[in-house]
């Protein structure tokens, strides 16, 4: 991390561009070497953020105030970090996003501060995104544009008039809470658009670790929506308020750290921004992270297996969190109530799905066999399991394997499901919540496992489940291929 001596050296060199550039390069190299030794994603981006803060504040003291003061109450202008930099997650090749916030009566001060800082930053080689805004501008632009609103949501004071910045925080926070449902709809549409562009599955052969499904952006959406809808400023705060389970917080924290290490190393190695895990990068990163080849399993396959497992958990946690934010419409609640009927005393079957009503949640969680019964009822009724019930099943299983799952009766009930139509969908849902690998521990080794070539589109677990579903489709189909399959099946 940046030491007081580092900060003093940067401040002393702030009037000498060549010397300052050399100090920054030396400090970045020290951060890179620490990253290579310890592979700590969170610590590395925090160190890069702290370095940028120190550089900017040294320049501010030199070119704006010619003194030591950072907080200048009444000056009418504040320098604010926004976006990823404001969030405190500055990767090696990230842009620097700044907002120069000014009071309407101090526009001249705002222009002078922005000019005084931007030119030295450009001379140092930084790519700086910047804006000059009043509080009113922030509210109006944030209202019209969800991307601007998101960047402002992550604002962080750096220097200047802190009182002005705090007034912005209050006004923007009030507007954010008032318009949280609109923001939710905007961000969900944006999220789907990102999936359409960067890949609708976690299991891409060459995923974008930031924007593909299961990438860092999924984590950002949880943070953004948690902030907008609940005012929570961290994953820990979401968990403390019961909006994330302990296992979900653990999955998100692990994803942030591991993906942070990978992205940091990609930026350092390339010397520029780039987030696509190409085949060549997969091999290099596997070696960097210490994944060695084993008999019948390459190091790169082990690395990508961890990536797919982690990104799947990240994406599924994000999906569950977003479902908690979405309220069913009145019409939806009415139609569900009209068509609902109880089955097995715990479950409710509607025309759309099998669910667990709120009044039965405690009974469901207290019964170790309830999760398997849920899937058996859904298969027998020819309905999918409701997303809320899948979330509940995932929660019930999050404590780890239960001895009940290894009991002969459990195994018998499980394999009995294979004799009924719909087993393909049932197995896929079981896999989503983690039940399949608890009933069949051998299946866990197939989870997220990808063969390292361009010919296998899916991981071993997904490929296996799709093969079962294909067999189900053939068994119930009417085409020539289905007919041949049914004739052959009759003679097995």
Roles of regions detected by a PLM:
Residues 1-491:
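A nucleotide- and high-energy phosphate-metabolite-utilizing enzyme signature
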